[in-house]
């Protein structure tokens, strides 16, 4: 398990320098002010909902909001969506993170036929994850969801955050984006300062790759760009699958994000 203590002792090793820098930044007044604002947003959200959940799949952003949400509402349920095509170290990390977080959680698979999509026999199930989670939320009377959405990730998300704000209501209930103004590094800071388990994928890039572009869940293209060389370097067994997926989906075609 990668934690702050381990990073402090191994900061000179490949892939850990930028994480060590994050740990230093986490002690600054600027970061502490952002943390206060994020917690204030959560306080507002929890004051208007009765049966909320926190969406957390083990990535840096969802880990950050899970940690912060549990500070405000210790018994809020963690909702974890499980893809059929995870990277090899995701499962162990998610289990470790959920153990560390403690409290109630639910894991919800959203299966689709990866082989048929790669073969071109079926279309990529755009929006399946959202549909499955929405159905589960409706079935269980969920009236609000905390999400690890950040404006920095894309122009689409930036515009959405600007128009809706950090706490808003949709037809399916309330939404809270406590870290919408955080950078990727600031998201990691939350986990670092809590000494929470950190997805090992963040040590596999020698401190040179933008944290916004790292694949920390599945190997399917998701960033509107081409991470094939990164896959070849850090997950060579999955590079071929990623290349097939690029050919099926098309380079530069990022999945539509609805939140």
Which role fits each region the language model picked out?
Residues 1-259:
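Nucleotide-activated chemistry modules centered on ATP-dependent adenylation/adenylyltransferase
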């Amino acid at each position: 398990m990668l934690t702050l203590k381990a990073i402090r002792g191994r900061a000179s090793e490949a892939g850990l320098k930028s994480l060590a820098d994050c740990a230093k930044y986490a002690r600054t007044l600027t970061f502490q002010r952002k943390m206060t604002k994020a917690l204030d947003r959560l306080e507002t959200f929890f004051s208007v909902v009765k049966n909320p959940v926190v969406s957390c799949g083990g990535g840096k952003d969802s880990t950050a909001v899970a940690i912060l949400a549990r500070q405000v509402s210790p018994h809020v349920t963690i909702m974890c969506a499980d893809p059929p095509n995870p990277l090899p170290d995701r499962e162990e990390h998610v289990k470790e993170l959920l153990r560390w977080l403690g409290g109630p959680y639910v894991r919800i698979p959203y299966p689709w036929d990866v082989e048929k999509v790669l073969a071109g026999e079926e279309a990529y199930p755009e929006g399946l994850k959202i549909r499955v989670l929405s159905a589960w939320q409706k079935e269980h009377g969920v009236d609000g969801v905390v999400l690890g959405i950040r404006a920095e990730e894309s122009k689409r998300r930036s515009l959405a955050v600007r128009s809706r704000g950090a706490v808003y209501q949709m037809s399916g209930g309330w939404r809270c984006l406590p870290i919408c103004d955080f950078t990727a590094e600031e998201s990691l800071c939350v986990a670092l300062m809590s000494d929470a388990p950190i997805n090992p994928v963040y040590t596999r890039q020698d401190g040179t790759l933008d944290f916004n572009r790292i694949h920390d869940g599945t190997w399917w293209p998701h960033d509107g760009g081409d991470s094939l060389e990164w896959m070849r370097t850090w997950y060579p067994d999955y590079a071929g699958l990623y290349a097939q997926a690029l050919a099926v989906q098309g380079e530069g075609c990022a999945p539509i994000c609805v939140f």
